């Protein structure tokens, strides 16, 4: 949930959260403006550019984390930038979102700070639109739905083949992201995750997803007590 995300950031170091209410205070949107979850991703990218310009103006390392929502269930939000290329709103929203993130990344690449900045694009889950929906009609029945992840301008050395056709999970993104930032990880494992750049087998590759899922479903009162 959004509240869980806020808790994670507010309980770790000194994150400054720029939310919907901040957008109104800063004049990006009118006081009574609200669409979908608050405001569309077009405004998010405008705000992000301003934040990046401010953050990169100092010599200190910085982190900017963004959450896009235009493609969220059930049909996504069709903003003014979206074209009617397809006969389904959701398909048009996805195409529009793809173009916006592409334009944003290309903008970053033109900035001076890009040379020592790593970009991580990560999905939190596959789309929640039911597979019986007509939007999937052009896909083969054997098509395997996956979460989109990519890392651009990683600050680590690796062999190209270790990033291809891997069986991994969200847990592996933790050490992989840190490795992409130049962090040296002893053993290339953190928690249940494996640094994908290392070429070492992930737990799904080593033990199989069936076993991993079975073990993760086990209950532990002490562990649950932390939450």
Label every model-predicted segment.
Residues 1-227:
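Solvent-exposed soluble domains appended to multi-pass membrane proteins
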């Amino acid at each position: 949930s959004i509240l869980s995300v806020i808790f994670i950031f507010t309980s770790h170091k000194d994150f400054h959260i720029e939310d919907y209410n901040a957008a109104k205070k800063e004049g990006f949107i009118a006081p009574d403006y609200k669409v979908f979850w608050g405001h569309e991703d077009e405004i998010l990218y405008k705000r992000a550019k301003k934040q990046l310009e401010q953050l990169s103006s100092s010599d200190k390392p910085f982190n900017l984390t963004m959450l896009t929502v235009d493609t969220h269930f059930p049909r996504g939000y069709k903003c003014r930038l979206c074209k009617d290329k397809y006969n389904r709103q959701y398909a048009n929203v996805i195409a529009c979102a793809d173009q916006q993130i592409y334009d944003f990344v290309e903008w970053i690449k033109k900035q001076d700070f890009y040379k020592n900045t790593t970009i991580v694009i990560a999905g939190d889950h596959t789309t929640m639109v039911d597979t019986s929906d007509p939007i999937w009609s052009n896909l083969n029945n054997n098509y395997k739905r996956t979460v989109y992840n990519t890392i651009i301008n990683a600050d680590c050395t690796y062999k190209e083949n270790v990033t291809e056709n891997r069986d991994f999970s969200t847990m592996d993104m933790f050490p992989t992201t840190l490795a992409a930032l130049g962090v040296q990880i002893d053993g290339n494992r953190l928690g249940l995750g494996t640094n994908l750049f290392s070429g070492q087998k992930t737990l799904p590759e080593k033990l199989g997803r069936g076993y991993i899922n079975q073990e993760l479903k086990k209950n532990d009162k002490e562990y649950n007590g932390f939450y």
